[in-house]
């Protein structure tokens, strides 16, 4: 190594974590907080009475750590004392540097016995990464940066390799960061005086986009694009094309770039094996994406700035992205032990046909991975999953090993779900630590992970979490979302107008968490009220405070007993500590669970009327327009999604540790979601109110196709999942039989034949549908998210671009920056409009106006969803807590598992 390079590397690596430069926002001095007992907190905030607390120490009582609180909004995480088997993790201030740099907070660990993980060693993540042989990118100019993960990189080396791959070098200055350009200007509020001159200038610059021309085109689009779209929504497509042209000079259009050492070994071997055929396929894909793709400005930003990566200084082309995804999925299918069976169910004879089939589904947007997985699949030493559900009982101590595992997962861009009320640590300290570190990650990465904090509402620690949300709004953590596990006993007492509700310490609350059956939980709860220490609160006030936190702190409501009662598990199971961060996937095991999302685009099943003979088939639903919905195409897409999901599970288990394989083999969950439901209804000319039967029929066919494909895999010779005997499928039941018997559109003979095959051969998978938000995937393909209705004909969404980006002279933390908001056009509404003044009447309903219709449709479709349905609730500024409580009681009676995913102002 060059001595100069060695000195530079040593200089950069010596930068301490969370370093503050002169001129930056200084951190607050630590302030000692007054200790409050659980009874005082209950009486002050919730409305409880000190006399209601029985004598004796509260199990699981929390104390404020004396380490102090730092300003989380300035980007510094707060840790307040985590016990780790005799060792204590604490923050200590370092002495100021001679140049006057403010003191920094460094993470130290007192001496104490180490706490090994389950494998006898500290595990940094789910996938088995190989840090040895990790390539180092040589930068033209090494810039001094804040290595906020320096202390964590020593424990988890794969983080540094992941950050090298995730980063980009900007085209304008050559700075290493997360964006392709620097200096996003404030968008213009008014239209330019001469719009034709502006369009001519964009066209001229796009023809000479090499060098600084691309930066000039980028500035013109960001400056005038939002205002132009608001004035004329149809120009959104043209601006999207110009946005792609700004990147043409730096794009790599050869598929041989995926033979790089940055890519996975299976992808490299596949590319080298088919190096003669891939260039032609890449050229056809690029031409299709350019001509047939519906890329608006917001979709183009998602594609180029969140999905595309940079390989050796060159950006991926949009066509190359879909080719990489198809190659990675094909390699996962071919490298599986069951590749022959997978090819049979995909109706392909060799891997070339598999590649063509997968590529067609990907580029058309019929089947889609999440935007995070689309950006990482095919690369080496990066996670191949979307979320992590942390349910490992060995993490209850919140030790250094557990914190490193969660932080390393966040550093890779993966969102995490954690139940803080079941940890042997101060809940507020865990939230501050994980939330502060997550905010630091969100400053550096394009994919912004979140920490979903779950709270058991029968634990006394829930009071501390509610106080934390209500009182510390000034230092709100942008990367933290909350979820409240509401038991049935709380809803029943509110319905019966009982004023007393009890909260227990951790030993008692954990014992209650082991009782998944509603009757057993209520019986043990009544017994504990008579014999155990407790905190008594007012039921109405407690629920109102919880809903106020939901409106203020981006929290969701989970009816945890409904999750167990209407699940596939036949045996008695524990109450799940947490769902997935998107509130769609359930997990019933006592181990960490990675979640892989796969979305079916329902809007791609709508076709124009061209074949008159096909219109009379039983699987065809005619619309009020000249379009029809083909249910047979939907079943075909779901069948291929099941094959893709099983191949991805095989690839994930082969690259992970033994305990990950053991967790996935129990139920082999697929987590299949939907997108574009409201877009399909608008194109058919239907309203949500008139489409309840159609929506129920769509999800019936999806569930039937998923179960049939899983049975056929076992029928072909694959083994059934391990927990098949513990599910309702062992008894010959389907998920909709746990509810009322719906009106089935599929013939009963087909259901009975499926039941007989299921009892004879078993199921390869036991969890299929999980209707999550998947909003970025929907916006990428120009459709509505999930089963939600469209918010409007033209509405705004936040982008990854910031109006106050960091530079060498000034630094703004995440909470100070203002993200660039770009209008998003509803193309289903735009399709039926002509020129200005000649617009036809299009059937369109905004989401706040048809919220009740969407909820009723969710009630009908939830009988076929074996996991959860995440909904959006639109509220008015004048809505009182009593109205929210009434709606919450309605969601409970409708047997929703998740009361609401998020709250939005109408």
Curated annotation (Swiss-Prot):
Residues 98-109 have a biased composition (Polar residues). The gene is RIR1. One of its GO terms (biological process) is deoxyribonucleotide biosynthetic process. GO terms for molecular function: ATP binding; ribonucleoside-diphosphate reductase activity, thioredoxin disulfide as acceptor. Does not possess a ribonucleotide reductase activity. Betaherpesviruses probably use another strategy to expand the dNTP pool in a quiescent host cell. GO terms for cellular component: host cell cytoplasm; virion component. It comes from Human cytomegalovirus (strain AD169). It comes from the Viruses. The keyword Disulfide bond does not apply. Residues 1-70, 89-129 are annotated as: Disordered. This is Ribonucleoside-diphosphate reductase large subunit-like protein. It is found in: Virion; Host cytoplasm. Keywords: Host cytoplasm, Late protein, Virion. Belongs to the ribonucleoside diphosphate reductase large chain family. Coiled coil: none annotated.
């Amino acid at each position: 190594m060059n001595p100069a390079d060695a000195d530079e590397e040593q200089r950069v690596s010596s930068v301490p974590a969370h370093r503050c430069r002169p001129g930056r926002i200084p951190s607050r001095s630590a302030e000692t907080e007054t200790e409050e007992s659980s009874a005082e907190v209950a009486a002050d905030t919730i409305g409880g009475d000190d006399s209601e607390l029985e004598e004796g120490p509260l199990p699981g009582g929390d104390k404020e750590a004396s380490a102090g609180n730092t300003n989380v909004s300035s980007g510094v995480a707060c840790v307040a004392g985590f016990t780790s088997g005799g060792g204590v993790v604490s923050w200590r201030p370092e002495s100021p540097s001679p140049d006057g740099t403010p003191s920094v907070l460094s993470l130290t660990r007192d001496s104490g016995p180490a706490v090994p993980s389950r494998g006898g060693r500290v595990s940094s993540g789910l996938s088995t990464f190989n840090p040895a042989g990790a390539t180092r990118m040589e930068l033209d100019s090494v810039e001094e940066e804040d290595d906020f993960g320096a202390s964590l990189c020593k424990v988890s080396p794969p983080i540094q390799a992941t950050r090298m791959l995730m980063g980009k070098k900007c085209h304008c200055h050559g700075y290493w960061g997360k964006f392709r350009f620097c200096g996003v200007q404030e968008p213009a509020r008014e239209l330019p005086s001469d719009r034709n001159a502006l369009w001519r200038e964009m066209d001229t610059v796009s023809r000479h986009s090499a060098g600084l021309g691309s930066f000039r085109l980028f500035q013109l689009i960001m400056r005038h694009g939002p205002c132009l779209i608001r004035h004329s929504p149809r120009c959104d497509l043209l601006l999207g094309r110009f946005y792609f042209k700004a990147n043409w000079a730096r794009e790599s259009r050869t598929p041989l770039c995926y033979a790089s050492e940055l890519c996975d070994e299976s992808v490299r071997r596949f590319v080298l094996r088919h190096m003669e055929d891939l260039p032609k396929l890449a050229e056809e894909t690029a031409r299709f994406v350019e001509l047939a793709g519906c890329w608006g400005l917001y979709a183009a930003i998602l594609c180029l700035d969140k999905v595309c990566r940079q390989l050796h200084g060159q950006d991926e082309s949009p066509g190359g992205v879909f080719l990489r995804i198809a190659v990675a999925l094909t390699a996962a299918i071919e490298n599986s032990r069951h590749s022959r069976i997978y090819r049979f169910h995909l109706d392909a004879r060799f891997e070339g046909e598999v590649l063509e089939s997968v590529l067609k589904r990907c580029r058309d947007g019929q089947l889609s991975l999440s935007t995070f997985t689309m950006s990482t699949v095919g690369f080496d030493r990066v996670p191949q999953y979307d979320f992590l559900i942390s349910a490992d009982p060995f993490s209850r101590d919140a030790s250094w090993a557990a914190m490193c595992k969660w932080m390393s997962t966040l550093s890779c861009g993966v969102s995490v779900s954690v139940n803080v009320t079941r940890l042997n640590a101060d809940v507020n300290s865990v939230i501050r630590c994980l939330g502060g570190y997550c905010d630091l990650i969100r400053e550096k990465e394009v994919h912004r992970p979140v920490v979903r904090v779950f709270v058991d509402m029968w634990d006394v620690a829930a009071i501390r979490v509610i106080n934390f949300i209500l009182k510390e709004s000034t230092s709100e953590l942008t990367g933290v979302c909350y979820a409240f596990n509401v038991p049935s006993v709380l809803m029943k007492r509110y319905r019966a107008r009982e004023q007393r509700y009890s909260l227990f310490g951790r030993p008692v609350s954990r014992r209650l968490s082991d009782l998944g059956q509603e009757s057993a939980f209520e019986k043990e709860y009544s017994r504990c009220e008579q014999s155990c220490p407790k905190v008594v609160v007012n039921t109405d006030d407690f629920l109102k405070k919880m809903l106020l936190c939901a409106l203020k702190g981006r929290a969701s409501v989970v009816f945890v007993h409904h999750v167990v009662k209407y699940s596939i598990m036949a045996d008695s199971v524990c109450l799940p500590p947490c769902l997935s961060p998107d509130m769609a996937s359930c997990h019933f095991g006592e181990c960490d669970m990675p979640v892989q999302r796969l979305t079916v685009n329902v809007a791609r099943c709508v076709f124009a009327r061209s074949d008159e003979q096909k219109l009379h088939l039983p699987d065809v639903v005619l619309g009020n327009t000249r379009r029809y919905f083909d249910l047979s195409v939907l079943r075909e897409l779901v069948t291929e999604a099941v094959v893709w999901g099983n191949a991805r599970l095989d690839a994930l288990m082969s690259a992970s540790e033994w305990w990950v394989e053991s967790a996935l083999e129990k139920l082999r969950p697929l987590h299949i979601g939907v997108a574009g439901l409201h877009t399909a209804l608008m194109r058919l000319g239907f309203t949500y109110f008139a489409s309840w039967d159609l929506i129920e029929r769509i999800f019936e066919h999806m569930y039937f196709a998923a179960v049939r494909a899983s049975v056929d895999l076992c029928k072909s010779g694959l083994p059934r999942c391990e927990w098949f005997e513990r599910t309702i499928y062992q008894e010959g039941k389907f998920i909709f039989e746990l509810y009322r018997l719906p009106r089935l559109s599929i013939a009963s003979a087909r259901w009975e034949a499926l039941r007989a095959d299921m009892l004879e051969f078993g199921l390869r998978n036991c969890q299929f549908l999980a209707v999550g938000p998947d909003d970025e995937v929907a916006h990428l393909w120009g459709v509505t998210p999930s089963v939600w209705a469209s918010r409007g004909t033209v509405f705004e969404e936040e982008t990854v671009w910031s109006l106050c980006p960091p530079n060498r002279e000034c630094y703004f933390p995440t909470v100070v920056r203002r993200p660039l908001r770009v209008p998003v056009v509803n193309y289903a509404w735009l399709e039926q409009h002509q020129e200005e003044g000649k617009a036809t009447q299009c059937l369109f309903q905004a989401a706040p106006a048809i919220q009740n219709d969407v909820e009723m449709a969710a009630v009908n479709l939830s009988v076929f969803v074996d996991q959860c349905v995440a909904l959006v609730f639109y509220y008015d500024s004048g809505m009182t807590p009593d109205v929210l409580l009434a709606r919450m009681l309605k969601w409970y009676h409708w047997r929703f598992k998740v009361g609401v995913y998020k709250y939005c102002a109408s």
